[in-house]
Structure formats: C-alpha cells, structure tokens
C-alpha cells in the first residue's frame, strides 16, 4: 500500500503553529516544571496528533529553548520601550525598574521559566543568549550613563548586576507571596532605583 505523501508546510504555517505551541508550552512548563512536559503532552494540550509537534521541534530541549527565547524577547522589548525617548539616567533606571516589575506580574509564567527552571549550558542556544544579553543591556547602559554623569561611581557592569539581583530578589519574593513584613513591592523597588548609589 502506497503511503499518503505528507503535505509540505509553508513558512507561515510553521511559524503560526510554533507560536501557538510556544504559548501553550509556556503554561505547561510553568505548571509542571521541565520534567513534567513532553512533546506528547503538548500535543494533547493543543488537540493535535501525538506526533504533530515533532514536525516543528526536534525535541523537548529545542521547544524549551524557544519558549525561553520568546519570553526573553518580550522582556527585552518591554525594557527597550520603557526607556524610549528618556535621556535622564536616573529616570531611565526608574522606568526600567517599573517595567521589570510589570513584566513579572503580568507574565508570571514567562518570568518563572526565564529565571527559575533548568537552564541550558552556555553556548547551546545562541538566539536565546542574544535575547538574554539584550534584556540586560538596557539596565547596563542606564547604569553606565549614570556613572558617566557622575551620579554613580565604580564599575558599571558590577553595579548593574547588583541592581538586577536586588530587583529580581524582590520580585521573586513577591511572586512567592513572601513579602509580608510590612513593605510593599512597589515601595521596595522604588527605594532600589531612587537610590541606586546604595548598591555597592
């Protein structure tokens, strides 16, 4: 018996399915963790045959990298948009802090996947690493501008890492429901970015 030839997918069809699959996989990875998701479970979520995802993704690792890449792309775009047209370094830092918090609260699944789940070894997925670097670059640039303007002292890369660690810690505590000692997330983030010189 002669098998039926598989239809050749257009670039648009591949892109549309991948976008739908990445959105569904984001929810699944956030709910079940990395080990709790398979391409077959994704197929069930999407209502397609068990083998359909294999036409679009080589394996689960590739799917996960695409989920994280897309999350970092949206996050980086939010950081970029937050400082568009802003020239004052201190204002840029403040707006970046607000954008960071807004993204984490609006997209907790994506935020969890970006920073909390299993990470691939460096050099495995260049596109993912490029978006990660871009998302950090806006904070680094704002800190460097603050150093250049005499508002901050010291190494800009180190200071940017300190600020990132501070806000990430605050946001993570908030999302876990553990900021319960009398200070709100907004108050604490405002303190971090109103007085970035406190980060040593």
Regions picked out by a protein language model, each given a short descriptive name:
Residues 113, 141, 145-146, 163-182, ...:
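Amphipathic C-terminal alpha-helical segment
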């Amino acid at each position: 018996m002669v098998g039926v030839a598989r239809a050749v997918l257009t670039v648009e069809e591949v892109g549309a399915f991948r976008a739908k699959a990445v959105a569904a996989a984001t929810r699944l990875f956030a709910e079940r963790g990395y080990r709790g998701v398979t391409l077959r479970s994704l197929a069930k979520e999407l209502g397609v045959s068990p083998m359909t995802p294999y036409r679009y993704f080589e394996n689960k690792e590739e799917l996960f990298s695409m989920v994280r890449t897309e999350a970092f792309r949206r996050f980086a775009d939010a950081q970029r948009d937050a400082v568009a047209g802003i020239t004052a370094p201190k204002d840029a830092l403040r707006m970046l802090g607000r954008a960071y918090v807004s993204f984490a609260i609006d997209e907790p699944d994506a935020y969890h996947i970006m920073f909390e789940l299993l990470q691939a070894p460096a050099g495995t997925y260049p596109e993912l690493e490029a978006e990660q670097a871009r998302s950090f670059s806006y904070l680094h640039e704002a800190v460097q501008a603050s150093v250049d303007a005499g508002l901050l002292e010291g190494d800009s890369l180190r200071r940017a890492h300190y600020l990132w660690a501070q806000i990430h810690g605050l946001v993570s505590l908030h999302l876990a429901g553990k900021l319960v000692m009398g200070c709100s997330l907004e108050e604490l983030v405002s303190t971090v970015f109103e007085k970035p010189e406190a980060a040593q």
